[in-house]
């Protein structure tokens, strides 16, 4: 009732495959590390991959729409008394901080926090309450994507 005699040799075949895969991965890492030295981009660095031109254009369009519709003002110039801290970075507002106040919900954020939310994370809704801060007509009039509004319709139907 013990193990079969050829059990050890059956286990050695997968270990050879694992060793081969390890060596291939090692050489891949070496080639990736040498790419910048020979003028090629690194192919394993996902943080530095460039977006396609369409995506880059879409991000710049959304950022310019945000600049147009949500102006930057000083925190001390706000007519109402909003929250004491930015809910994106959790830092307290100072009177001379440059902020953006969203028109629909009134939430206030540092301008760089909201800009990063828009551009880096591609979010077009308030970080706190998820209200769309770009009106749908502005969103669809802009060429903020491929021309179809399937994504926003999908999001609208889930809310």
UniProtKB/Swiss-Prot annotation:
The keyword Chaperone does not apply. Keywords: Metal-binding, Transferase, Ubl conjugation pathway, Zinc, Zinc-finger. InterPro entries: Znf_RING, Znf_RING/FYVE/PHD. PROSITE patterns: ZF_RING_2 (PS50089). GO terms for molecular function: transferase activity; zinc ion binding. Pathway: Protein modification; protein ubiquitination. Predominantly expressed in stems. GO terms for biological process: protein ubiquitination. Coiled coil: none annotated. Its EC number is 2.3.2.27. It catalyses: S-ubiquitinyl-[E2 ubiquitin-conjugating enzyme]-L-cysteine + [acceptor protein]-L-lysine = [E2 ubiquitin-conjugating enzyme]-L-cysteine + N(6)-ubiquitinyl-[acceptor protein]-L-lysine. A zinc finger (RING-type) spans 86-130. The keyword Ribosomal protein does not apply. Probable E3 ubiquitin-protein ligase that may possess E3 ubiquitin ligase activity in vitro. This is Probable E3 ubiquitin-protein ligase RHA1A. The gene is RHA1A.
């Amino acid at each position: 009732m013990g193990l079969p005699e050829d059990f050890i040799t059956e286990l050695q075949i997968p270990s050879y495959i694992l060793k081969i895969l390890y060596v291939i991965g090692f050489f891949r890492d070496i080639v990736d590390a040498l790419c910048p030295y020979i003028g090629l981009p690194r192919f394993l660095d996902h943080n530095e991959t460039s977006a396609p031109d369409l995506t880059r254009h879409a991000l710049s369009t959304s950022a310019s729409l945000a600049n147009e519709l949500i102006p930057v003002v000083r925190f001390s110039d706000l007519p109402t008394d909003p929250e004491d801290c930015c809910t994106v970075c959790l830092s307290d507002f100072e009177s001379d901080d440059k902020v953006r106040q969203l028109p629909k919900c009134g939430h206030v954020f540092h301008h760089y926090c909201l800009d990063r939310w828009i551009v880096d994370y591609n979010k077009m809704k308030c970080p706190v309450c998820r209200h769309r801060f770009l009106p749908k007509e502005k969103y669809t009039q802009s060429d903020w994507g491929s021309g179809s509004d399937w994504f926003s319709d999908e999001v609208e139907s889930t809310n």
